[in-house]
Structure formats: C-alpha cells, structure tokens
Amino acid sequence: MPSNDARVATERPTLYLTRLCEHFADQSRRHSDQEFEVAFDEGKGFIDFAPVVNGSCRMDAREEGVLILSVSGIDDAALERVQRIVSKHVERFGRGDGLTVEWGPASEQHSRGWFGLP
C-alpha cells in the first residue's frame, strides 16, 4: 500500500491532532455518507477515510515541536487524495500559525504501524 509522511513544525502538535480527529469524527456523526473511523488519545491519532477514499492517516504529536502525519492509500490515486484532504485541513486549521504540509516517502518506522492504533 503506497504511503507518505510529513513532519509539520508546530509548537502545538497535540492541538492540531485533536482538531483533526474531532473534525472528522464530527463529520462522521453529521453525514451518513462519511462514516470515518476515528481514534485518538495520548498524542496519537488515526483516521480511516473510507467510504470517501480507501486510505487513512496516522498522526503522532508526542515529539516536541512537530506533528508527524503518515498517510496511506489503496493505490497512488487514493494516496494523493488522502494527502490533499489532510493537507487542506491541517493548513486551514493552522493558518494562524502558518502551518504547511510537505509530503515525502514514508519512513519504515511509520509504515510498520508504530502508533499502536488501528
């Protein structure tokens, strides 16, 4: 499954992880066609974007000063769509702090599921 990572510099990584997870959990509650699986606690988060797109995002806010994002998709098109969704939301939520998301190849550590969430 193709995957990419991003390290987003921020003084408030836990805040942005929580906002992302709460936003998509709220979307799931409000729209029956967007039943995302969302889990988060202790500086880690997970969003499964099915049925909108076959892909997911894992987040880690445990490292000081950085929000680590790891996205995957069933194929390259799904990966690209998940990246666009996540980037758009992180940059919108972090507009006041000037957050930007730049994707690169996934590290082996992230691709092995070290988050301890689904």
Enumerate the predicted regions with their spans:
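Beta-strand/loop substructures that line and gate deep hydrophobic ligand-binding cavities in soluble
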Residues: 53-73
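Terminal, regulation- and interaction-focused segments at domain boundaries
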Residues: 1-16
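C-terminal structural segments of small proteins and small subunits
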Residues: 70-106
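Extended Gly/Ser/Thr-rich low-complexity repeat segments
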Residues: 22, 26, 59-64, 80-92
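Ser/Thr-rich, low-complexity intrinsically disordered terminal regions
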Residues: 29-55
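Amphipathic alpha-helical segments
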Residues: 13-29
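A generic structural signal for beta-strand entry/edge sites
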Residues: 3, 42-46, 64-68
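Short, low-order "capping/linker" segments at domain edges
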Residues: 104-118
